[in-house]
Amino acid sequence: MAAPRNVFKDRLRSQQIGLFATLNSPALAELLAGTGFDWILIDTEHSPGEMGDVVAQLHALQGHEISVIVRPAWSDMVLIKRLLDAGAQSLLIPNVQTAQEAASAVSYARYPPAGVRGVSGGSRASQYGQSADYLRTADEQICILVQIETPLAVSNLEAIAAVPGVDGLFIGPNDLAASMGYLGDAQHPAVQAAVVEGFARMRGAKQAPILTQGRIKFAAFKLRRTARFGDLNGLLPVLDNMAHSQPR
């Protein structure tokens, strides 16, 4: 049995639109799989989701065309190993500020000698040992995206982008705004200017500019600047807007 290809990684330089899922609901994840989005991100950084919640959502999404990204709570060797063994192929690593931190994240996702990922002979990722080529092909199918969320990370952007195994950069305006002194104001002109500058520098570094999370207005602003991986909104705001739009 052949190991699955990472379709999201194959299409990384085409514009893909998706949603952040923070409610830990397999039913909602399965519902979203049929709505035409390119990807769904299962979040464990800003949600109470644990490993069992992630696996349940991966099960619900299996067999659907939608791609799945998982965000670990932190760039941690054990967390990353467990998510990859559970079957995640694309990870969004939060709060990466230096090239060394990016290199560490990549190493956690790769088997020796390229990295330090522990080897399981019967993980869900290898279809419980039935994928004979999983260990041989896993490293090339793993997609590592890193979040640029602070002025320090922005200043190190080119060095982070140059780390082998970093497949894309995420500019997160909410944390960037907070770290710039504009907590809760990702629309501030200084924050938007920093995002535009970051996108330009990504292109200079030959990295595909990637998503930013936030309101639709800000996402559209970003996508017009050739983002390749766009998050038009999170699932929670979508549901909130739907609920508030219903007649009373």
Predicted regions and their residues:
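Alpha-helix-loop-beta-strand connector modules within alpha/beta enzyme cores
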Residues: 51-85, 107-114, 136-140, 187-210
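Glycine-rich phosphate-binding active-site loops on the catalytic face of alpha/beta enzymes
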Residues: 90-104, 169-180, 217-241
